[in-house]
């Protein structure tokens, strides 16, 4: 068994937000290996959060984030079970972090895989099935390759599947479940909207010469 020091326990706690006793137990269970202890705690945290996932989360808060330069803005609804938790530092910090994550992920359109419409999934499948590099391959192998590519593509569209911008060893889903384990309540990302300045507006690309010509003709 590795030498489990107080500093090692504290470092693991700082990384995971788990309690001191849980961190010590994780290190004992993994012979003092921090990476394995981190994984052990993550699994424990996820299991803890999943026990709460069936409970109704009807309280919460709507957060906003405006990125530097005011060119990207986000509105995000995060739900929990009680108003008391919604006002707390852990919940509000999570709300801010997830809102920032949305701002940093322009391709994200859905909260979870379950929200992706079937027609979008089917369209992605047709695109992948038609790729040149799959021609001539046996159907069974082709299906397997396409399945992997579709899963990768769909995860790119989903907020909860994104690597957390402040710690890429975690996903956004991990982050939410860690917070749920800390506060002892179910937490759900309900919905979000991302705004980009000028998005959808057709800009007039008229050059200077054309502009002068149009002025003369008036």
UniProtKB/Swiss-Prot annotation:
Transmembrane segments: none annotated. One of its GO terms (cellular component) is cytoplasm. InterPro entries: EF-Ts_dimer_sf (IPR036402), Transl_elong_EFTs/EF1B (IPR001816), Transl_elong_EFTs/EF1B_dimer (IPR014039), Transl_elong_Ts_CS (IPR018101), UBA-like_sf (IPR009060). Its main location: cytoplasm. Keywords: Cytoplasm, Elongation factor, Protein biosynthesis. One of its GO terms (molecular function) is translation elongation factor activity. Belongs to the EF-Ts family. This is Elongation factor Ts.
């Amino acid at each position: 068994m590795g030498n489990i020091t107080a500093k090692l326990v504290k470092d693991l706690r700082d990384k995971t937000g788990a309690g001191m006793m849980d961190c010590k137990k994780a290190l004992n269970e993994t012979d003092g290996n921090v990476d394995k202890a981190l994984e052990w705690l993550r699994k424990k945290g996820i299991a803890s959060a999943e026990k709460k996932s069936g409970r109704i989360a009807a309280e919460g808060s709507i957060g906003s984030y405006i990125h530097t330069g005011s060119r990207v803005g986000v509105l995000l609804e995060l739900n929990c079970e009680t108003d008391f938790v919604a006002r707390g530092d852990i919940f509000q910090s999570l709300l801010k972090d997830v809102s920032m994550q949305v701002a940093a992920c322009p391709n994200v359109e859905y909260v979870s895989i379950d929200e992706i419409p079937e027609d979008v999934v089917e369209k992605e499948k047709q695109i992948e099935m038609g790729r040149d590099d799959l021609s001539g391959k046996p159907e069974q192998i082709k299906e397997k390759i396409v399945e992997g590519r579709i899963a990768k593509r769909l995860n790119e569209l989903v907020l909860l599947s994104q690597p957390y911008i402040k710690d890429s060893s975690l996903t956004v889903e991990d982050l939410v479940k860690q917070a749920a384990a800390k506060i002892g309540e179910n937490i759900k990302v309900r919905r979000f909207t991302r705004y980009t300045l000028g998005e959808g507006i057709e800009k007039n690309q008229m050059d200077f010469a054309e502009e002068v010509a149009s002025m003369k003709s008036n």
